[in-house]
């Protein structure tokens, strides 16, 4: 409840203050249950925009975000999956195991940014191989 409310309120305030707006289309194409969503990451707003539209989102995120007071604690409380980007193969195995465990407990919608970080619109893509491994190992759409 709290993340969905916070997300909707933040997006509404951003629209009112900055005069932006958002147009969400294609929600009817999302499957039921667990699945992988791999969008481009272009701003902070990308991370919160999905909460109102997914049943139980599960983010894979950089470990450093868990160090932010209160925010980091809440990330862990929501059972998101922090990744240590220093050791790629070890980190990937840990992420696959943690994601598999979370999806076995409850159908969750995995959100992972396949480039690993924010990139400006129009920048050349730099996709990481982890998304392919997750898709193969988890067996979800």
Feature names for model-found ranges:
Residues 16-141:
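Soluble catalytic domains of membrane acyltransferases
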Residues 1-19:
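N-terminal membrane-anchoring alpha-helices
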């Amino acid at each position: 409840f709290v993340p969905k409310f916070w997300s909707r309120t933040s997006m509404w305030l951003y629209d009112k203050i900055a005069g932006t707006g958002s147009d969400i289309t294609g929600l009817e194409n999302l499957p039921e249950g667990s699945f992988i969503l791999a969008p481009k990451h272009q701003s902070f707003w990308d991370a919160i925009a999905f909460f109102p539209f997914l049943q139980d989102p599960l983010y894979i995120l950089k470990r450093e975000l868990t160090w932010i007071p209160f925010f980091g604690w809440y990330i862990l409380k929501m059972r998101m999956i922090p990744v240590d980007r220093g050791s790629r193969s070890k980190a990937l195995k840990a992420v696959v195991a943690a994601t598999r465990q979370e999806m076995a407990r409850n159908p969750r919608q995995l959100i992972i940014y396949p480039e690993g970080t924010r990139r400006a619109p129009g920048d050349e893509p730099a996709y990481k191989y982890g998304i392919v491994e997750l898709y193969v190992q988890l067996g979800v759409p």
